[in-house]
């Protein structure tokens, strides 16, 4: 910890490497076997799990960039086995949101220069490629991947196992298992390669396709399409996850452009 500025009341686990010029605040808890790179800042009210790596110049627990923030105590919580690369910024939560906490789940990977704003919730096994920017209160479900230089509007929800193409601007929710991209962002198919890598069977993937054919390709509005999928398709976990996501969407889901689609 030579040349590092670590508050004596910070709780540091076993086998933690703290590089030169790191700053760690008073109300910080870092789990075992972590590595904190040079010039990183871990500010107050941050809890970091075990086996995490935080690289050079990252700032974890910065004050929210939100005018509703009034200096209240709020938090960042990072799970186990998380990697946060150079110059990422992760802001604390806000009381105004009702969440008061920014969360990054286990086994997630934030590449260089990613920004995670106040009250975002990133699930487990997520990948955010370099220069991704998440606005406040964005939810990213488990196993989602967001391509580099993508910008995500506040309150947006990205579903489980979804993949967002690099350079996207998202202002609508991305339903589970989908690939989206282009400008404006549109649905372009199922994330088949990613799903097969994670052990999904073709039978499961076909059930996803069946749902999305009705949602996007029957000429119905989304509400009517969901009712049709509910009535016409047999029950399955995949159907339930997709329809529940759409039913609970607050911003509406991304549109479909048949000229851009890879859906079969």
Where are these regions (language model features)?
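Terminal amphipathic alpha-helical/low-complexity segments used for targeting or macromolecular assembly
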Residues: 1-3, 8-9, 14-15, 51, ...
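Structural signal for interior beta-strand "rungs" in well-ordered beta-sheet cores
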Residues: 1-181, 185-186
